[in-house]
From Swiss-Prot:
Belongs to the FBPase class 3 family. GO terms for molecular function: fructose 1,6-bisphosphate 1-phosphatase activity. One of its GO terms (biological process) is gluconeogenesis. Pathway: Carbohydrate biosynthesis; gluconeogenesis. InterPro entries: FBPtase_class3, Metallo-depent_PP-like. It is an enzyme of class 3 (hydrolase). Keywords: Carbohydrate metabolism, Hydrolase, Manganese. The lineage of its organism: Bacteria, Bacillati, Bacillota, Clostridia, Eubacteriales. The keyword Hydrolase applies. Gene3D superfamilies: 3.60.21.10. This is Fructose-1,6-bisphosphatase class 3. The keyword Hydrolase applies. Its EC number is 3.1.3.11.
Length: 665
């Protein structure tokens, strides 16, 4: 006991300066003791629910729906709460109301004959759901989440249990007054959004917000207003981040991909970027070229005129050629990238329209190259350079794009360690024997965690450096390397065969060899080694990975390496759904364990509201906690325990007279 007392005295002395500062915040024994009790209570609350999504690819309608229904969590809560008390049709209506309160209320107000009765029944049900989803949080945390205009009323309704006669009358009178003063519609909207907020404590987006889908900017708007979110950048995200940072080669890739999928709305409508300079240039130089290989891939639910398709095709080819030229320049600037094999324009034989790759000749299926000088194939002609500068200026000066990219930097990283899980989009580059691949950056080699840390720093410098500085140009090229470099943790392939897919019919040339990581991600020992590299040694640690769609219809399992690695690809991109057989996976991590959720196809928001159709989701509880996880078991819990330790030292210092209490007279 004496030894323990001496140890505590030493700890107080070692931390005395800090404890004096802490005493300003908790100036009395009572205040320090109260905070200790509060923190100890919080540690014993159930851990909050984490929601993991990946590979959204600009599909904003499906993304917003999955966000609103929390991958089926709200529907399951309604089932648990009401059981047999409500019919299935009533449960569906209640769920739809919680997801889309404003839109659903507009429909109900036109249909419902006795709206006051409907309001009364619905308000009681919503309060019951809200009480359930708020039960795992402190009153203080719930209070911070409450909408200001109804904060007092909601707090009263959540914490008043209408059991006694007086309490029941008080409770009923609040509901009655909300309806009588014509505030029921606004109240229902507010409490529905509160339920959406409370049902998920933290959202993780494991990359690729951007890509071929219609409006990635709408998704970014939604994430900006979300209460707690982090992002692990994907390869498509980094491309847009590079474009906003002033990288012409990243920008050319962004425009080419958008044109390929006839998705120019994110660029033009979302970010206000004028593509007229490219359209004019394309008509001038490719006006008589049918550009058959560059016809956009159009989804069945979109309609374009023949002229629109032709124009997009010409823009597509024009920017593709510009891209190949800019990439050639970047490769020449950086021999350390080891990407000389991707310089293909100089390998074209313009006499017989062939190209030699790996010692074999291939016939080109398109020989119209009006802007390529065969003696200097990577040189931009004046008109191309002018188009690039105009477009680059538009990307760099788009206020909304800059705001979104700043958000990606402030809320994102290449990887994240969170609650014993390692989150990243692509891969950790490996050698053929499963060891970490060393990658040369500048004059130093990096591997494993150090590689991702270095690339993360370079990506940030690219955006935040002064424009036109030498450094910013180097970092801009590094962002492009992250998009398509052979050892990029975001790309994860030996090469990107864009040129071959456009100009060579032989599909053997289209093959893109994957990083050895994708062979080893089924190997438990390799996955454990990756986790240890990032400082995660716990038996409960997992890798949560996106990027590559899981081919469920061919029997592929998203749970790999004996549960150490989980692949989630939200399946939001319709182009992959025929390949995967489902609309993808999301992950829920709550106090009871990990739940993998597979989703069927989502149709439209309009149908979800009018016909009350929800995404059909199947849940697999693949890892159940032996005991319910508490806040004390989380990363936040570690911080709280540190605070508790410091407060206990402060309390002891007060009691020993080493620090004086400050009691107001």
């Amino acid at each position: 006991m004496l030894l323990e007392s001496n140890t505590k005295n030493e700890e107080i002395k070692d931390n005395l300066k800090y404890l004096v500062l802490l005493s300003k915040q908790y100036p009395t024994i009572n205040e320090a003791a109260t905070e200790i009790i509060n923190l100890q209570a919080i540690l014993n609350l159930p851990k909050g629910t984490e929601h993991f999504l990946s590979d959204v690819h600009g599909e904003y309608e499906q993304f917003i729906h999955v966000l609103k229904n929390a991958s089926g969590v709200i529907k399951r809560k309604i089932d648990d709460i009401f059981g047999n008390r409500l019919m299935q049709s009533e449960k569906k209506s209640l769920a739809t109301l919680i997801y889309y309160p404003e839109q659903k209320l507009d429909i109900i107000l036109k249909q419902e004959k006795n709206i006051d009765d409907w309001y009364k029944i619905t308000l009681y049900r919503l309060i019951e759901v809200c009480r359930n989803v708020s039960s795992k949080y402190t009153r203080s945390k719930v209070r911070k989440a409450l909408p200001k205009e109804f904060s007092y009323i909601i707090e009263e309704l959540l914490h008043e249990q209408p059991k006694g006669v007086d309490k029941q009358e008080y409770y009923d009178e609040i509901i009655k007054t909300i309806i009588s003063i014509d505030r029921a519609k606004e109240f229902i909207t507010a409490i529905s959004k509160l339920i959406q907020r409370l049902v998920v404590d933290r959202l993780h987006i494991i990359g690729d917000i951007f890509d071929r889908g219609p409006r990635a900017d709408i998704i970014m708007d939604k994430l900006e207003e979300y209460h707690a979110v982090d992002i692990q950048w994907g390869n498509h995200d980094i491309l847009w981040m590079g474009a906003a940072s002033g990288s012409s080669v990243c920008m050319a890739n962004v425009i080419r991909i958008s044109a390929r999928y006839a998705n120019l709305s994110t660029i033009e409508d979302g970010y206000g970027i004028n593509l007229l300079p490219l359209a004019t240039f394309a008509m001038d130089f490719y006006g008589n070229d049918k550009c058959k290989n560059f016809e956009p891939k159009i989804e069945s639910d979109k309609s374009y005129t023949v002229k629109e398709i032709e124009l997009i095709g010409k823009m597509h080819k024009a920017i593709a050629i510009i891209q190949f030229k800019l990439e050639g320049e970047a490769i020449k600037r950086h021999p350390e990238f080891k990407m000389e094999h991707r310089m293909l324009l100089n390998k074209i034989n313009f006499e017989d329209s062939t190209i030699e790759l790996d010692g074999k000749k291939y016939k080109l299926n398109d020989t119209s190259f009006p802007t390529i000088d065969k003696n200097d194939p990577y040189k931009l002609i004046d008109e191309e350079r002018e188009v690039v500068e105009k477009l680059r200026s538009s990307f760099v000066n788009s206020e909304k794009l800059n705001r979104h990219v700043r958000f990606l930097f402030s809320h994102g990283n290449l990887y994240l360690k969170f609650n014993s899980n390692l989150l990243y989009h692509g891969c950790i580059p490996l050698n053929e024997d499963g060891t970490f691949k060393e990658v040369l950056i500048g004059s130093h080699k990096y591997k494993g965690k150090a590689l991702l840390d270095k690339l993360d720093v370079l990506a940030r410098k690219s955006f935040f450096y002064e424009e036109n500085s030498k450094n910013s140009k180097y970092e801009n090229d590094m962002i492009w390397y992250l998009w398509s470099g052979p050892f990029s943790p975001l790309f994860g392939k030996e090469k990107m065969t864009t040129f071959e897919r456009y100009f060579i019919d032989d599909k053997k040339t289209h093959y893109e060899k994957k990083d050895p990581y994708y062979h080893y991600r089924d190997d438990e020992d390799i996955c454990i080694n990756i986790l240890r590299e990032f400082g995660l040694d716990s038996e409960q640690a997992h890798i949560i990975n996106g990027h590559v769609p899981v081919e469920s219809k061919n029997g592929e399992n998203p749970i790999k390496a004996n549960g150490k690695l989980i692949v989630i690809d939200g399946g939001f991109s319709k182009a992959y759904q025929s390949k995967t057989g489902i609309a993808g996976y999301t992950l829920i991590y709550n106090s009871f364990g990990l739940q993998l959720v597979s989703h069927e196809l989502f149709e439209t928001t309009e149908k979800a509201i009018k016909e009350e159709t929800d995404i059909i989701s199947s849940t697999v509880i693949f890892e159940k906690s032996v005991r319910r996880k508490r806040v004390g078991d989380t990363d936040i819990g570690k911080d709280l325990k540190k605070q508790l330790y410091e407060l206990n030292l402060l309390l002891l210092a007060y009691k020993k007279g080493l620090i004086k209490e400050f009691v107001k007279s």
